[in-house]
Curated annotation (Swiss-Prot):
Its EC number is 6.3.2.1. The active site is at residue 37. The reaction proceeds by a bi uni uni bi ping pong mechanism. (R)-pantoate binds at residues 61, 155. Signal peptide: none annotated. This is Pantothenate synthetase.
């Protein structure tokens, strides 16, 4: 695996791959890699000739009082995991390489309406930071395909919309959620869950699946379903951020005649904010 810290040298290496007719896959991450990240790399490997993984803890997507300074930096371990699955390139720039003029002077990319709801409502500016850095990374790597995890469903929907609106020539591929045996979605932030909390945090996945089952059985009282789910999370001792039943494409509140629905939820433990989602496709 070749490791690059600078845009120019990575571009030169990838230009040679393109001249050789190679199809380039890309997996953008913030590091602290776990099995779900590695599965995204494997998906890219199945679809492409060479794979680039990036590791950059993007300060632009962290708000005030969020955990940018606490976010685990585990580059040596991450590199070893990528080497083990034969990733071709690792791009790990520093902040100056990505934001040479500083973040205050950085041109921003904004996807209207979709970035201000759900996670965007409680994390103002977060998705603006995501779309900006992903646009920059797409321009640097110029991949044929980019793989994102379904766990971050809103992020996936926002990036799909951004790519469509800006005519960026990249195929967005979704990787399924990878879960622990009790249903907890794998996340870099799971390391902040305490030992006392750990047996109970799968409540988020359970209540979302409960809503899914009731929708599949014909219920369309979305407001009541979401309220009951929030009550279950409260009863388990966690603070609810949101439970929402949405149109899978637009992220607007689901209508009774929608056929593709995603149920999204977020809750707080003592040291982490956890998100999850499940989708329903109705006949």
């Amino acid at each position: 695996m070749q490791v690059f810290h600078h845009i120019r040298s990575l571009r030169e290496a990838l230009a040679a791959e393109r001249r050789a007719g190679k199809r380039i896959g890309f997996v953008p991450t913030m590091g602290n890699l776990h099995d779900a990240h590695i599965e995204l790399v494997r998906i890219a490997q199945r679809n492409c000739d060479v794979v680039v993984t990036s590791i950059f803890v993007n300060p632009l997507q962290f708000g005030l009082n969020e955990d940018w300074d606490k976010y685990p930096r585990t580059l040596a371990a991450d590199s070893a995991k990528l080497e083990a699955v034969h990733c071709d390139y690792l791009f790990c720039p520093d902040e100056t390489e990505i934001y040479p003029n500083g973040m205050a002077e950085q041109t921003r990319v904004i996807v209207p309406t979709m970035i201000d709801v759900l996670c965007g409502a409680s994390r103002p500016g977060h998705f603006e930071g995501v779309t900006t850095v992903v646009t920059k990374l797409f321009n640097i790597v110029q991949p044929d395909e980019a793989v994102f995890g379904v766990k971050d469903f809103q992020q996936l929907a926002v990036i799909r919309r951004m790519v469509q609106d800006l005519c960026i020539p990249v195929k967005i591929v979704a990787g399924d959620i990878v879960r622990e045996p009790d249903g907890l979605a794998m996340s870099s932030r799971n390391g902040f869950i305490t030992a006392d909390e750990r047996p109970h945090v799968a409540v988020l996945n359970r209540v979302l699946n409960g809503i899914k089952q009731q929708i599949e059985q014909g219920s369309r009282d979305f407001g009541t379903l979401a309220a009951e789910a929030r009550a279950h999370i409260d009863a388990a001792g966690f603070r609810v951020d949101y439970v929402s039943i949405c149109n899978s494409r637009t992220l607007e509140m689901a209508a009774h005649d929608d056929r593709e629905i995603t149920i999204l939820g977020a809750m707080y433990t003592s040291g982490a904010r956890l998100i999850d989602n499940v989708s329903v496709v109705l006949a």
